């Protein structure tokens, strides 16, 4: 398995990683905590952005960033993988369920993400403006063209 994270560059070289995984019979796992909600044409994350939807074996993410700012997270995978994690993942076994309000807020945010590109477009416009103004003020900015801008 090759875990990759799309935090700094939204691509994470996923097409190349997927090709290598296919060649060697490996699984591909992506931590998309910094991409789901605003990366990709429909905000589905780096796998959508890189045109490998349906070809990433395990996607993990958080509900604490673009999906509402609450707590909690998720793992999306085949049923067998999720069941194995439910039985073997100690943090999962010894954690509490999410509060209903957090679940409801996250569902609402997912509905907003699916409803259109207006919020994503505004985010990207704000990120470009921030990057432009901070650079003009003499700050050195790290990272690629991403809504998360390390200063």
Pin down the residues of each PLM region.
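Active-site core of PLP-dependent enzymes with the aminotransferase class I/II
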Residues: 1-25
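Short, small-residue-enriched loops and turns at beta-alpha junctions
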Residues: 3-8, 35-38, 92-93, 150-151
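Conserved PLP-binding catalytic core of the aspartate aminotransferase-like
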Residues: 121-128, 136-151
